[in-house]
Amino acid sequence: MQLNSTEIAELIKQRIEQFEVVSEARNEGTIVGVTDGIIRIHGLADVMQGEMIELPGNRYAIALNLERDSVGAVVMGPYADLQEGAKVTSSGRILEVPVGRGLLGRVVNTLGAPIDGKGAIEADGFEPVEKIAPGVIERQSVDQPIQTGYKSVDAMIPVGRGQRELVIGDRQTGKTALAIDAIINQKDSGVKCVYVAVGQKASTIANVVRKLEEHGAMAHTIVVAASASESAALQYLAPYSGCTMGEYFRDRGEDALIVYDDLSKQAVAYRQISLLLRRPPGREAYPGDVFYLHSRLLERAARVNENYVENFTKGEVKGKTGSLTALPIIETQAGDVSAFVPTNVISITDGQIFLETDLFNSGIRPAVNAGISVSRVGGAAQTKIVKKLGGGIRLALAQYRELAAFSQFASDLDEATRAQLEHGERVMELMKQNQYAPLSVADMSVSLFAVEKGYLKDVELDKILDFEAALHSYMNSEYAELIKTINDTGNFNGEIEATLAEALEKFKATQTW
């Protein structure tokens, strides 16, 4: 087809008429100082707190200090080649990370970019890392359990869906092990999990990922990794990124669990940034807003009501509540829970699981100190059968500790005291549990029933765990229907009690442990 000159002129005229001049006004500033990942920018007006600033080389910084004639920003990534005099521009955007089901089974960095070598991630969208927590009216009370699979936790310190339960203890006391087992135990519960690793060795994070894969838990888990080699900015932001990824499920009427491992290292990273920004130091050289650092993060873990979910999904999801349960981890120094960051987080959370070095070294693992560990939600978030059978466990342990200390000085003890001591010893022994072996509700109930009803009285102390393993095996093969009923309903009635008693009598008669 041949076009003549008139048609060509007409086409050009149409194009000129349709042409729109799009002018985009953008703030530009100049870097006047670069120090340890902190840049000071002059001439950048109208910048928001937390706004992303575009740097040369397709990099970003986040504005944290807004001063009269300059802006202090922290660089996200390498900064060695940044020079004074370089031009930067404001983006008008707050930092966002990818969210969605495509992240499940993947290992990502703070910005949501994959670091596991499995290719690109298909995200459902992007959401800001900093969000306002749901208000009081949008929340619902916590009354559904989230099973950790640990006898000592589920019986004495129950965790509910939407709760914030602190895991606190010295280094090497099993804090990460407890959190990882809680994630493994959600395999068949439909709860999506997020594991945020802050300031840990890359080899440690790789080991955690390997264990999750071995136990089939990676399919329902997102791992957000900000290792010790990452910049302080990425370590500080990692928990917020992970929280946004977990909120995706909460806001759509699902249940999610997030583990922050650990918030002590996040506080140290934030202290480093604050001191470099020349903010005035306070107690232990932390900045004045370190409480707000953790409170605004942990308040986002909540159980939201049906109206919130319905409004958020614009009516797509109805009649469902959503929850985000948080297990923040705090590392103490020589058991000092009265330090600045531990006391802050204890006051924010709904209870704490305190792990003790002495218990750990004496072979009691998980090393839960039942005396000062507490759940402020309590029995409201417990399965009925575990609540009924585990009610006397904490009391038995408390009495045992008191009597054990007293019996060291007393030579002759009366029969009742000796019986209490022996019962306490058996409870202590039964609370021991191997790593990567979380128990189902039914198996846990069988163990609690055995100790509560006195079936362990004549079992030697060093044979109790063998007895328990053999009992679980026997119950799962001979009473599979009962085990299924307990796991499905969690109820406890006279019929179940009678069947459990009959099963234990039969099992003890076999002498197979």
Curated annotation (Swiss-Prot):
CDD domains: ATP-synt_F1_alpha_C (cd18113), ATP-synt_F1_alpha_N (cd18116), F1-ATPase_alpha_CD (cd01132). It is a peripheral membrane protein. One of its GO terms (cellular component) is proton-transporting ATP synthase complex. It is found in: Cell inner membrane. Gene3D superfamilies: 2.40.30.20, ATP synthase alpha/beta chain, C-terminal domain, P-loop containing nucleotide triphosphate hydrolases. ATP binds at G169, D170, R171, Q172, T173, G174, K175, T176. Its EC number is 7.1.2.2. One of its GO terms (molecular function) is ATP binding. The record marks S373 as: Required for activity. InterPro entries: ATP_synth_asu-like_sf (IPR023366), ATP_synth_asu_C (IPR000793), ATP_synth_asu_C_sf (IPR038376), ATP_synth_F1_a_nt-bd_dom (IPR033732), ATP_synth_F1_asu (IPR005294), ATPase_a/bsu_AS (IPR020003), ATPase_F1/V1/A1_a/bsu_N (IPR004100), ATPase_F1/V1/A1_a/bsu_N_sf (IPR036121). It holds the Pfam family ATP-synt_ab_N. It catalyses: ATP + H2O + 4 H(+)(in) = ADP + phosphate + 5 H(+)(out). The keyword Transport applies. Keywords: ATP synthesis, ATP-binding, Cell inner membrane, Cell membrane, CF(1), Hydrogen ion transport, Ion transport, Membrane, Nucleotide-binding, Translocase, Transport. NCBIfam families: atpA, PRK13343.1. Belongs to the ATPase alpha/beta chains family. HAMAP family: ATP_synth_alpha_bact (MF_01346). Produces ATP from ADP in the presence of a proton gradient across the membrane. The alpha chain is a regulatory subunit. F-type ATPases have 2 components, CF(1) - the catalytic core - and CF(0) - the membrane proton channel. CF(1) has five subunits: alpha(3), beta(3), gamma(1), delta(1), epsilon(1). CF(0) has three main subunits: a(1), b(2) and c(9-12). The alpha and beta chains form an alternating ring which encloses part of the gamma chain. CF(1) is attached to CF(0) by a central stalk formed by the gamma and epsilon chains, while a peripheral stalk is formed by the delta and b chains. This is ATP synthase subunit alpha 2. The gene is atpA2.
